[in-house]
Amino acid sequence: MTQLTVKALSEEIGTPVDRLIEQLADAGMKKAGSDQVTDSEKQTLLTHLKKEHGDTSGETEPTRLTLQRKTRSTLSVAAGGGKSKDVQVEVRKKRTYVKRSTIEDEAKREAEEVANREAEEKAQRDAEEQAKRDAAEKAQREAEAKVTREADAKREAEEKAQRAQAEKAKKDMNSKNADANAQAKKEADELKARQEQEATRKAEAEAAKLVEEARKLAEENQERWSEEEKKKKEQEKSADYHVTTSTYAREAEDAADKKDEKAPRRRKKKPAPATQPGNNRGGRNQRGRGGKGKLAKPTSMQQGFDKSATVAKSDVAIGETIVVSELASKMSVKATEVIKVMMKMGAMATINQVIDQETAQLVAEEMGHKVILRKENELEEAVLADRDSDAIAEGRAPVVTIMGHVDHGKTSTLDYIRKAHVASGEAGGITQHIGAYHVDTDNGMITFLDTPGHAAFTAMRARGAQATDIVVLVVAADDGVMPQTIEAIQHAKAAGVPLIVAVNKIDKEGANPDNVKNELAQYDVIPEEWGGENIFVHISAKQGTNIDGLLESILLQSEVLELTAVKEGMASGVVVESRLDKGRGPVATVLVQSGTLNKGDIVLCGQEYGRVRAMRDENGKDIETAGPSIPVEILGLSGVPASGDEATVVRDERKAREVANYRQGKFRDVKLARQQKAKLENMFANMTAGEVAELNVVLKADVQGSVEAIADSLLKLSTDEVKVNIVGSGVGGITETDATLAAASNAIILGFNVRADATARNTVQNENLDLRYYSIIYQLIDEVKQAMGGMLAPEFRQEIIGLAQVRDVFKSPKLGAIAGCIVTEGTIKRSNPIRVLRENVVIYEGELESLRRFKDDVQEVKNGYECGVGVKNYNDVRVGDQIEVFEIVEVKRTLD
């Protein structure tokens, strides 16, 4: 009879030991894990289990079922000699199925026990935390009461001491005033007398000093004049009267002069026939006095001109850049001469290379020409500088732009302000003709810009026209922060304009202004009551609630900014919008920023110009003049200017036309230059010397969590040399607003699990922006990190590749000292730089002139071989020296 222990039986049937012991106890048998179990006890346990599960049939059902399967197949395998053989393959599979009812019951019971324990522990923790909170609140209240009592007592003591001290000081002051007045009068009289004596003494000393200096100057001038006269006479005596610069011609001239001095003076004879005009042989047959057949020696080798020719010096006008060939043409010399001079000065250039103004100036002055420096925009600067500058700046009205999400009450706010504050008397109400208007309040005037969306605001900022002083952000109290609200915040921060938040619709059910504050705080818009810098005003545009408070907040912010402008003189401003009217031609809305714009003035607007033929205000009325912060509509320009262009009044219409034509010609160059911006591949070229490189990024993702994670990771990549600047971020697809913001900020666009719409793609293509899509955050971080690494300056490192020991020194007639060496480490290469070491001290650094092995020139010699080494421009090589060969390796820098 086979007997098993309880533990062995549990392992055989796949049931935990504790569970099996409980089942045996339920069947009436108390057993431990090491007790024996007989066959009869097994049968008793089986019968009990069947009754417990409702099975009284007595038949044994298996709890485990094992299936075995065999599969045979034939595999053809290549053998040697191009033949193949068949291999029998047998696959055996075995699978066991177990009944899970017992295990599931056990797991269910254990889960219930765990849940009960967790509930008890949670209740206990909650009770402990509540007790701690009650104790902390009680202690805090007691501490606050104690601090309040101490502060009151201290304040009362200080007030009492101050009153006593003030009474004492008043008594002392009354007694000292009389003595102080008499003493002060006496000291003033003494000081006045001393000052008069000191002034007299200084005047006498100054006069004596001037007389002495005049005497010394006269003596010095007399000595200098006598010395200059003496030097002049000596130079005339020793002057060299050669008429040529050639060495041989000078020697011949000196010999002829000596011969003429030795010859006796004779009567001048008739000139020889050879000098007559008809004799072309010029004295070839002229016989000398010495005898027949001898030619007469020439009296001198003097050339046929009396003085040397000099290059004509001229004035050379040089712009900001100039081509080498053009510079040579202006100096009337060959381009090769200019290149030679530049090579002597240490600058290599080609005939078609463009050089800067400073280099061209040095070259021209080196060649003896006078340089006139010119600027390309010299005419433009001269025209804009010819203005009235004597006027004094005065305070001006603020220019306000109202922005916000759609249906948040921006239009209603504007309408209510117009109805309440624009001067009455207009028949049929007020009609807005242009996109800007101004209102008069009790505390001052305010100018509003009605910009459709954020595109116009971004375009004006991209052209550098900061026309807006304050941005009012309208947020609905029931909707909260929306996508266009976030975009408005980003634009205001990028422009550096203060932000005033107008919380609208506070009279509506469900309005929650505190929720708006909490949402805006996530975008660094903090209310003043929370310690921030932004003013929050609760309004209702429909009921007109607190509109006056909004206007007062705007005027208060303008007083803090201290906005000033020149009211008199020639006007300047910015183009808010422009259009082409069918009956009136080009029409431009101009916001005057300084000066006074008059009807008939000549205006220069970007690439357009013209005389102001008519001016209208926002109500459509004709006006004659407009001061600062006043929007007007002008007619008479040559074309339609772009929004954001600067409008300036000039004196001369002809010069205005020239400047406009120059700007039109330069527009193409500017457009081509803009195509190279915001490229990850060209970021290193956009760096300027001595500045920190910035990588501007516009980030869009599918969820807010991804935006925060990616933005935090990108900002952590910033270093001292390269900085990541996130100019815009948000949730959702890439829109046209994002593309316009990237174009204005020179940024790249990164999309994480989002795509750009059709209008955004057109803007990206037209502006030639860099748009990239990602679905894995690590790929995005790695590519940005690689781009930032490419913006880092490279590092160079020296690596020693070989070392040779000098065994002997030989002399060569061509190369000088030749060192017989043996290579002890690495490899000696001919083209690499070397150092000569003596007792491990560097005594020379240069390059190899010769490397030979057995009289053959070689390129390299490896370790253990002998060779002959000739060091260029160095002959002091001694036995025992070491020749170290190294190479300069460029190390690519990374952000790691």
UniProtKB/Swiss-Prot annotation:
Biased composition (Polar residues): 57-66
Residue runs in coiled coils: none
Region (G1): 404-411
UniProt-annotated location(s): Cytoplasm
Domain tr-type G: 395-564
Region feature G2, mapped onto this chain: 429-433
UniProt-annotated stretches for the region G3: 450-453
Methyltransferase found in the keyword field: no
Record NCBIfam families: IF-2, small_GTP
Protein known as: Translation initiation factor IF-2
Gene: infB
